[in-house]
């Protein structure tokens, strides 16, 4: 049984659409690569929280980015749920048997990498120790309190070098880690959808630096983005 505070997440996952979550839809014939991530809610020492990872700083793309545990599906993964749990175990040492899956969000598309991502929502019913297991992919493992994500002064709007704007969060004890991109978008828009978001100042901007996006790549190697999904509606705080 999940705690009462998590019921809006469970119910929201059933009702939310891809158009509520993302501005891009995969074009016909894109043949995207399949991947899955785990959005795992638990109850930590500071109250309800989310399990997140900080990507290794030497990675070729998005080094140091805060993200859900997860990755590309393997041929042995029977379902996206199985893939998300496997990846979380490989990255953090999480015991999948302690996770109750309470929802699966609509599949979303990442145009630059042509990944179709399934977000699996879990309740950490029986907690297990977590740590960095794969140092090639993960720099640190974080438990970020939900209250920290809801605090308006922890919210900023990122500015991509190409001009795109996106929701983001300042996390960590010193608020020195930037949670942005796909993971921040899913969290922000799901929280918007279920009514958890508190009014925040969207005019507080954080300009993304090239190294945060490209790693060892150069800006010229980043693919051009397609036209956005016109059905996606920007709302307050997005």
Region spans (language model):
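NUDIX/MutT-family hydrolases
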Residues: 133-168, 173
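N-terminal leader/linker segments that precede catalytic domains of diphosphate-processing enzymes
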Residues: 1-67, 72-90, 94-104, 108-121, ...
């Amino acid at each position: 049984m999940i705690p009462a505070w998590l019921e809006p997440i469970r119910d929201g996952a059933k009702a939310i659409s891809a158009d509520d979550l993302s501005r891009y839809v995969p074009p016909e014939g894109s043949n995207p690569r399949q991947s899955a991530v785990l959005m795992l809610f638990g109850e930590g020492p500071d109250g309800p929280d989310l399990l997140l990872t900080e990507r290794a700083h030497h990675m070729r793309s998005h080094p140091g980015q805060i993200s859900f545990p997860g990755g590309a599906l393997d041929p042995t993964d029977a379902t996206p749920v199985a893939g998300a749990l496997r990846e979380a175990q490989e990255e953090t040492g999480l015991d999948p048997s302690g996770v109750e899956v309470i929802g699966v969000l609509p599949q979303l598309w990442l145009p630059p990498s042509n990944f179709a991502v399934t977000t699996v929502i879990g309740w950490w019913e029986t907690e297990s120790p977590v740590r960095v297991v794969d140092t090639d992919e993960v720099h640190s493992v974080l438990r970020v309190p939900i209250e920290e994500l809801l605090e308006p002064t922890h919210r900023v709007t990122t500015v991509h070098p190409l001009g795109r704007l996106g929701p983001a969060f300042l996390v960590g004890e010193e608020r020195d880690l930037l949670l942005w991109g796909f993971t921040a978008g899913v969290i922000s828009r799901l929280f918007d959808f279920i009514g958890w978001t508190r009014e925040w100042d969207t005019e507080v901007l954080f300009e993304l630096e090239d190294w945060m996006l490209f790693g060892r790549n150069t800006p010229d190697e980043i693919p051009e983005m397609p036209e956005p999904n016109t059905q996606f509606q920007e709302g307050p705080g997005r």
